């Protein structure tokens, strides 16, 4: 069984943390985030540390308090360092470009895919075949990266499509004559 929840989350200098009932709010150099903790989990702010523990000794509460602690730790990391996901585009004629506040993707369709960038997320295109998604909320960064990937997921025969950097694509052999 994991013991992640037992470790307190340190609040670094430059970050202000407030706990109001079940809501944990963080404010730092990269922005402001908040997270509502489940009712079965108790959250306390004590001497620059946030401590998470289950209210009851039920299996559900014990299962949730480690998750709640990890979510609070992600809030701290998000407002200090931020999060980043990198995507890679593979395929002939497949490319990405910024078009104002939108991301324009040429992915082999008869039309270009225009992705509107949500607020709080920054997308950069260092090369036409690379996309970098950054932001302070780990969930939103991952969601945006997954939405972009879903326009053309990598296929198993040639590996064409949009994939995460470092993602392994299971390759298949083509049919034989």
UniProtKB/Swiss-Prot annotation:
GO terms for cellular component: cytosolic large ribosomal subunit. Keywords: Ribonucleoprotein, Ribosomal protein, RNA-binding, rRNA-binding. InterPro entries: Ribosomal_uL6-like, Ribosomal_uL6-like_a/b-dom_sf, Ribosomal_uL6_a/b-dom, Ribosomal_uL6_bac-type, Ribosomal_uL6_CS. GO terms for molecular function: rRNA binding; structural constituent of ribosome. Pfam families: Ribosomal_L6. GO terms for biological process: cytoplasmic translation. It comes from the Bacteria. Part of the 50S ribosomal subunit. This protein binds to the 23S rRNA, and is important in its secondary structure. It is located near the subunit interface in the base of the L7/L12 stalk, and near the tRNA binding site of the peptidyltransferase center. Belongs to the universal ribosomal protein uL6 family. This is Large ribosomal subunit protein uL6. It comes from Bradyrhizobium diazoefficiens (strain JCM 10833 / BCRC 13528 / IAM 13628 / NBRC 14792 / USDA 110). The gene is rplF.
